[in-house]
């Protein structure tokens, strides 16, 4: 391949050299830029004695006329079919009237004359040949569409190992066995174990699916083929299936090895009903993947690792055992995982002594591994921008704000009234969050514009949360209403600054009613059917599966939740107007305050949630009570279930 490329480039250079030589020969033949005279004028000048000599080449009609007092000769041309002497006689002159020098003909002159015609011809022929080769290359390129575009990485020099992956310990444990399968296949074959055909990595974007697959290849020390699912399908029919065959042929020749298909949902979506033919090419590609992963030839030592963040749209045939035997879930890391990830990404970066990675991990709930890597990188960029040699807490804290809300918009200048309204708006959020027991503690309040926001109030949960309760949602709704209510109380008007808060509150209230079953009137029911459309690759489309009367009740429940949240926020802010003003004035002065500065304004501690639940009975005590009841001949009756509010018993008529 490299040799053909060199020959092709060399041919282009040859054509260019021929063109340059042809131009040079043409220029030399024209004799440069000498002044040209008519021979009749030259004869008149000879008669007047102004010409010193005439120089010419034997066999040529071109002459050089040297005038007296001039350094450069002038060029002229003899009449056709006569020599210099005959031409002079035509004007009544002879060779005695002027000095004539005749130089012998040079062989180079004949060559130059020949090249004048040969080189342009060769140049045109070269252009034709070049165009023919380009056309041939286009045909070869069309044929090469069927070749796989997978990039191969050898396992001789692993760049990524399990030591570079943190925060996904369970996933690493699952994939350690894959490494052992590749390193010691006889260990499992002796027990009759079948080597897993494929591993599917499932998780949100940025959780380390691609990094983990590269670490598996680095640990196993085997070749690693990497390709994206979108690289299989092209505009030509059959290209996708051909590329799949070529990819697995390369993998079998380099076995044992790993084939990594990123974003497999691009070709692995569930096959439709076969009507219309809009997805036939993608389905042919998927069918070929199914055959290659578990067809008649199932003895090769090739393991397929695929990654996706849409497992719900994948074809069931792709997920069955024998193809993707294991599905490894990579979720966003918890606080311990975030700390481990921060330690990995802070290697080689000079951190100041006051940097606490544990505290940093606590401040970044919901961050993925990619977010944390970006955070550390942003902090390093900020430190370099400030000409510092180390990365401090200030840079890391600001990097968190940049990742969450975007960079500061220092060019955005607010009027004094808008700035004051923003301060009271954010103070309303912060005060309501501080006074409600089930709301998350306030970590930072700022009126500095970032991204699309004029200001923001950042709350920070005290621990990682995997479930939400109704009381937490209700307090969250009240916090959303805090900014809107504060503007109304202080300025007796409302602004567009609360638009996003109202939208988020409405969406949360709707989900509480229609998805989470948190409505007393409607009960624990889910409303809205998610229909899976086969023609769109199982795209989700929500349709109403309830009556207009129920839709009205849903709207009423949403309005009730929002109204209750509004009243709670209004009550809190009305009772603590002095605190609201103090927070707003502090924001006007400092623009940004943290949770400790906010707590310093209060004398009483922050209200804590009261845990209410049944007394915990240990299994042994429960068994003892059951035995006593059996001996007494009585069993403790089960409590009767309360009727659902929507299913109240009707009185007998």
From Swiss-Prot:
Bias-annotated ranges (Pro residues): 638-653
Enzyme class, spelled out: hydrolase
Membrane topology classification: Multi-pass membrane protein
Annotated region (Disordered), positions in chain: 604-653
Cytoplasmic topological domain: 1-8, 132-653
Keywords: ATP-binding, Cell membrane, Hydrolase, Membrane, Metal-binding, Metalloprotease, Nucleotide-binding, Protease, Transmembrane, Transmembrane helix, Zinc
Family of the protein in this entry: In the central section; belongs to the AAA ATPase family.
Protein name per Swiss-Prot or TrEMBL: ATP-dependent zinc metalloprotease FtsH 1
Organism, scientific name: Sphaerobacter thermophilus (strain ATCC 49802 / DSM 20745 / KCCM 41009 / NCIMB 13125 / S 6022)
Name of the gene encoding the protein in the UniProt record: ftsH1
């Amino acid at each position: 391949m490299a040799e053909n490329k060199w020959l092709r480039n060399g041919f282009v250079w040859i054509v260019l050299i021929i063109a340059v030589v042809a131009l040079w020969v043409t220029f030399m033949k024209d004799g440069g830029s000498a002044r040209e005279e008519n021979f009749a004028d030259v004869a008149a000048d000879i008669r007047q004695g102004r010409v010193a000599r005439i120089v010419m080449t034997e066999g040529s009609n071109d002459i050089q006329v040297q005038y007296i007092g001039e350094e450069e000769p002038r060029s002229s041309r003899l009449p056709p079919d006569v020599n210099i002497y005959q031409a002079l006689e035509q004007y009544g002159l002879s060779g005695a009237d002027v000095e004539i020098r005749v130089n012998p003909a040079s062989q180079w002159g004949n060559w130059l004359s020949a090249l004048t015609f040969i080189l342009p011809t060769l140049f045109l022929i070269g252009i034709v040949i070049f165009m023919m080769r380009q056309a041939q290359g286009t045909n070869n390129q069309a044929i090469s569409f069927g070749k796989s575009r997978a990039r191969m990485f050898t396992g001789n020099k692993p760049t990524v190992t399990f030591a570079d992956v943190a925060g996904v310990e369970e996933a690493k444990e699952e994939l350690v066995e894959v490494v052992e399968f590749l390193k010691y296949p006889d260990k499992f074959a002796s027990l009759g174990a079948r080597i897993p055909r494929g591993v599917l990595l499932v998780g949100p974007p940025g959780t380390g699916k691609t990094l983990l697959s590269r670490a598996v290849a680095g640990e196993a020390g085997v070749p690693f083929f990497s390709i994206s699912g979108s690289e299989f399908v092209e505009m030509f029919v059959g290209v996708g299936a051909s590329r799949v065959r070529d990819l697995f042929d390369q993998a079998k020749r380099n076995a044992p090895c790993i084939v990594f298909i990123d974003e497999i949902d691009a070709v692995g979506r569930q096959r439709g009903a076969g009507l219309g033919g809009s997805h036939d090419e993608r389905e042919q590609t998927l069918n070929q993947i199914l055959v290659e992963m578990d067809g008649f030839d199932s003895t090769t030592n090739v393991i397929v690792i695929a990654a996706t963040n849409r497992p719900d749209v994948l074809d069931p045939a792709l997920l069955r055992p024998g193809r993707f035997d294991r599905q490894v879930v990579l979720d966003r890391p918890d606080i311990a995982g975030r700390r481990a990830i921060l330690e990995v990404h802070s290697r080689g970066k000079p951190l100041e002594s006051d940097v606490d990675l544990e505290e940093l991990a606590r401040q970044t709930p919901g961050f993925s591994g990619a977010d944390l890597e970006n955070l550390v990188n942003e902090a390093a960029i900020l430190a370099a921008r400030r000409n510092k040699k180390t990365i401090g807490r200030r840079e890391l804290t600001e990097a968190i704000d940049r990742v969450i809300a975007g960079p500061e918009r220092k060019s955005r200048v607010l009027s004094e009234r808008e700035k004051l309204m923003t301060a009271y708006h954010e103070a309303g959020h912060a005060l309501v969050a501080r006074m409600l027991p089930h709301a998350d503690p306030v970590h930072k309040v700022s009126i500095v514009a970032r991204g699309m926001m004029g200001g923001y109030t950042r709350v920070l949960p005290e621990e990682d949360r995997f479930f939400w309760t109704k009381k937490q949602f209700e307090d969250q709704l009240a916090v959303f209403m805090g900014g809107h209510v504060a503007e109304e109380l202080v300025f007796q008007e409302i602004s567009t600054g609360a638009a996003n808060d109202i939208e988020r509150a409405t969406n949360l209230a709707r989900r509480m009613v229609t998805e989470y079953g948190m409505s007393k009137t409607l009960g624990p029911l889910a409303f809205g059917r998610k229909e899976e459309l086969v023609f769109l690759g199982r795209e989700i489309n929500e349709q109403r599966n309830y009556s207009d009367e129920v839709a009205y009740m849903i709207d009423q429940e949403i309005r009730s939740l929002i109204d209750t949240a509004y009243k709670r926020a209004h009550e809190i802010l009305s009772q603590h107007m002095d605190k609201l003003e103090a927070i707003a004035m502090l924001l006007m002065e400092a623009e940004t305050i943290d949770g400790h500065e906010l707590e310093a304004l209060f004398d009483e501690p922050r209200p804590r949630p009261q845990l209410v639940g049944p007394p915990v009975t240990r299994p042994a005590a429960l068994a003892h009570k059951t035995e006593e009841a059996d001996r007494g001949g009585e069993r403790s009756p089960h409590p009767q279930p309360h009727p659902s509010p929507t299913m109240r018993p009707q009185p007998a008529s």
